Swiss-Prot record:
It comes from the Bacteria. This is tRNA uridine 5-carboxymethylaminomethyl modification enzyme MnmG. Its cofactor is FAD. The keyword Phosphoprotein does not apply. It comes from Dechloromonas aromatica (strain RCB). Belongs to the MnmG family. GO terms for cellular component: cytosol. It holds the Pfam family GIDA. Homodimer. Heterotetramer of two MnmE and two MnmG subunits.
Amino acid sequence: MLYPTRFDVIVVGGGHAGTEAALAAARAGANTLLLTHNLDTLGAMSCNPSIGGIGKGHLVREVDALGGAMAAATDEAGIQFRILNASKGPAVRATRAQADRVLYKQAIRTRLENQPNLTIFAEACDDLIVEGDKVCGAVTQLGIRFMAEAVVLTAGTFLNGKIHVGLENYTGGRMGDPPSVSLASRLKELKLPQGRLKTGTPPRLDGKTIDFSVMEEQHSDDPLPVFSFLGNAAQHPKQLPCWITETNERTHDIIRSGLDRSPMYTGVIEGVGPRYCPSIEDKIHRFADKNQHNVFLEPEGLTTHEIYPNGVSTSLPFDIQLALVRSIRGMENCHILRPGYAIEYDFYDPRGLKDTLETKAIHGLFFAGQINGTTGYEEAAAQGLLAGINAVRYVRGQSGWCPKRNEAYLGVLVDDLITRGVSDPYRMFTSRAEYRLSLREDNADLRLTEQGRELGLVDDVRWTAFCQKRDAIAAEQERLKSTWVNPKITPADDCIRVLGKAIDHEYNLFELLRRPEVTYTSLLTLPGAGEAQTDPLVVEQLEISAKYQGYIDRQAEEVAKSSSYENTVLPSELDYSSVAGLSNEVRQKLAQHKPQTIGQASRIQGITPAAISLLLIHLKRHNLSQAA
């Protein structure tokens, strides 16, 4: 059957990538269809009940700055909020929240159901309609044909998913959900470059059978952080603690005794797992010198006793899982509600994507999330938003949009994926961003909201709040720079009280704020300093911009130097065999990767500075240079 309505954009999958993609496309005004196999799992947190963390929290704030849903949903569902790296510099501080799974899904579904231009249909997608090298629609299990100009595929771990518990395995997209086999077969026919990856999850525990009194208790920060730039702590539900315990030598002996039945260590699992989120059996093997590993017991929600034991992801046989759990302090009588498991799934080499996340091989087909080799809700959400807005721009015949590496962690994420590919599931860290001093959580809105408004992603409420904040920062910064403190007028006692010492010549307030020991609040107590700003977000930006100005200015100079590379386009039809002086290895890599700019080419492994110089000479000699 051909569905009577033709859509602009179809989004396949209702996870974190799919929901952000559908919301972004619809916000931008496109008639959008979201296909999901189950309405009840829209926005489901398939693994850990948390959002954010180092690098990941930065992505969440960027999604929020562009009008996305993840941060706001977390504010409504978060049952514990903490700032990680709070004692370190602002570039690496990150928000992390435990979320009530049910409340989070409700928050996402409410936004989906109330989003204009968005239609939801509950049917698994079994096929894509492709004519020549262009996608034209999608076909469901029942054979219903939905037509569209663009399709965003966010299949998560469902493509040929296989679940492993010990040496037992069965097909599944996640525990309790069927895999997507027909769609996986169809994608193989399209000759897209693919591979297999693996991820895992720990057993879920019954909190009624755990002795929390012998564990370290961990509470929310005070005052409570918020994730969304429009959020406030009053939105948060009741806050719950987490608990910390640890494995021991007995635990490790139990794990070692089960390795002969581990799918990872017997070669049953072929997919590569996440390097930075290893299973407990992998930790014991890789870090044999450690006699204990922390286990964080995280509540799954306000209305359940279910506990997520962060740190013991495993695919060991169930009898070993039960024994290892019961060997841990406070968990001697613990009941497992659900076993831990590993899941293998198909992914597609992201080097086959443009920076818009459109596939190079099939026009109008976009990939986002774990299908691109990433791991994590936050990475998926960021890709989903980007793919959603670019699908709309593709339909409208507009140029694609992707922030650069110096503009957003989203830009770092995409650039890493499409230039370097993945050998194991990709996770975001602040260390991946060379311009991280400028890419902070606190200024994500100042970096991206104006672009989001131009793209049609930012509504009037967010735009008004942003403009008020932006203008207040600019006005107060200008006032500080034009308000002077003169030692002949300001009493020395006041200078010593605020600055720690007297001053010997005139300074403006902004110059004084650059001093590490001086706070904005104390500075404004100087006679004649004027009325202080009361908005803490404005004050935060004033202090950071003053104290880190020198570093930020130097980073801006580095960006300016590299911008010529980033803005020089490599024609898609360029024949690298015609570029004089390139080695055969370099030619093969460039032909395989098809970088869009000189900047992307420079980050491909094995591409030397000399090769980049030869490319630039070739472009200039043949009048092929053009700006991005």
